[in-house]
Regions:
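Small cysteine-rich, disulfide-bonded extracellular modules of the LU/uPAR three-finger superfamily
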Residues: 1-76, 83-119
Length: 119
């Protein structure tokens, strides 16, 4: 059996960064609440170039125009997508419930994806 070389893993990481451009925030039932694209100022790739662990950071505030009308709202998961709506999740992660109840609340999600995954 062949082995993927470091350059192959870097190519996979580059593909993910170039194509998985949306983060979907989910509620306590893991139902979609909001999907935000990497072009939005609230979402950025924050890992070091060439790092094995990709990191996307998303910061939302209760005062955001697409959030304030949802309050109070509990967030408990996130997923990465290639498309703006519908589509299949490329990666999913659950986190401790956070209930945003006022416009002064803020949630920071640091979504980490290790390629390759090392156990």
């Amino acid at each position: 059996m062949s082995v993927v070389q470091n350059a192959g893993y870097q190519d996979i990481r580059n593909y993910i960064q170039d194509n998985w451009k949306y983060i979907e925030l989910r509620d306590e039932d893991q139902d979609p609440v909001l999907r935000i694209g990497i072009g939005d100022s609230r979402v950025t790739w924050t890992h070091t170039a060439g790092a094995q662990t990709l990191e996307m950071t998303c910061v939302i505030k209760g005062s955001d125009s697409d959030v304030k009308n949802l309050l109070p709202k509990t967030f408990a998961g996130a997923a990465l997508f290639k498309v703006e709506s519908e589509g299949s999740a490329m990666s999913e992660e659950e986190f401790t419930n956070f209930t945003m109840s006022s416009e002064s609340d803020q949630l920071t999600i640091i979504y980490q994806l290790e390629v390759p995954q090392v156990d």
